[in-house]
């Protein structure tokens, strides 16, 4: 089932960052954020850290291993769908169910964030295609992105280069705003109402990078991939900007709960 809507085309900038708090102050923020992971050992990384710093608890679920996704997000402040080694085009039942489920936060206008595979699943739910690069190139390492006018209006301070780990990309869904572009994979970030998709991985911690470059060392032999040592030398240069941008982005994204949701939570 594909979601259809006519979201407002005006990009509303994120508010200035709030200070980190031990506990959220408003009723909506007391609700946990749904975290969707795709491997037994996966973690929400820096995104989880940023949400916890704002006072949110995390409801972690792994549909691939039998965890059910909720029929509504009324009990959650928002949802994040992370990456994984599978494809959004895979025929597995859990992949199809997860893509179908994305209609729930879209319909309820809850904050939704897709990272890499999660962004591709969101794009598919919105009717866009997901496919490998025409020449077989991948992005594994740090690559430049270019924020669009809409992206700069939404959130300032975009990093010049960001971390990637993917071999597929997607078209910009109809009705979505392009927030950032790239070279080999043109769509790097987009917005559809309160839903956002990021093709790159600002969630990756230093420990995660060690695991990925060790267990996924064969990926670095693919066309376009960077050798393992460059992942760490470029991290030393670009990571601070990517982390600062992510913290601002997460704060602004999770604050986009619909007004009706806030009123219901306060009752």
Predicted regions and their residues:
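Catalytic nucleophile loop
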Residues: 105-129
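Structured loop/turn residues at beta-strand edges in well-structured enzyme cores
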Residues: 74, 138, 174
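Amide-donor transfer/coupling interface in amidating biosynthetic enzymes
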Residues: 29, 35, 146-267
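Short glycine-/acidic-enriched loop or helix-start segments at secondary-structure transitions
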Residues: 44-46, 70, 90-92, 123-125, ...
């Amino acid at each position: 089932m594909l979601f259809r809507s006519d979201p407002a085309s005006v990009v509303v900038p994120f508010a200035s960052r709030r200070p980190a708090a031990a506990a959220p102050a408003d009723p909506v923020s007391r609700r946990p954020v749904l975290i969707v992971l795709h491997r037994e050992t996966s973690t929400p990384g820096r995104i989880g850290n940023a949400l916890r710093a704002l006072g949110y608890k995390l409801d972690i679920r792994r549909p691939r291993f039998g965890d059910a996704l909720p029929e509504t997000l009324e009990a959650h402040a928002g949802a994040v769908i992370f990456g994984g080694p599978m494809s959004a085009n895979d025929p597995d039942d859990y992949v199809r169910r997860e893509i179908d489920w994305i209609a729930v936060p879209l319909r309820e206008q809850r904050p939704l964030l897709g990272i890499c595979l999660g962004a591709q699943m969101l794009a598919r739910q919105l009717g866009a295609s997901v496919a490998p690069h025409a020449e077989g190139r991948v992005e594994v390492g740090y690559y430049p992105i270019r924020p669009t006018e809409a992206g700069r209006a939404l959130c300032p301070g975009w990093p010049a280069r960001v971390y990637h780990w993917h071999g597929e990309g997607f078209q910009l869904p109809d009705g979505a705003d392009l927030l950032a572009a790239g070279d080999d994979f043109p769509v790097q970030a987009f917005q559809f109402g309160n839903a956002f998709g990021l093709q790159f991985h600002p969630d990756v911690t230093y420990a995660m990078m060690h695991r990925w470059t060790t267990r996924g060392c064969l990926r670095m032999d693919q066309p376009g991939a960077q050798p393992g040592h460059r992942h760490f030398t470029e991290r030393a240069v670009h990571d601070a900007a990517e982390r600062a941008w992510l913290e601002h982005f997460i704060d602004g994204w999770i604050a986009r709960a619909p007004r009706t949701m806030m009123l219901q939570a306060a009752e």
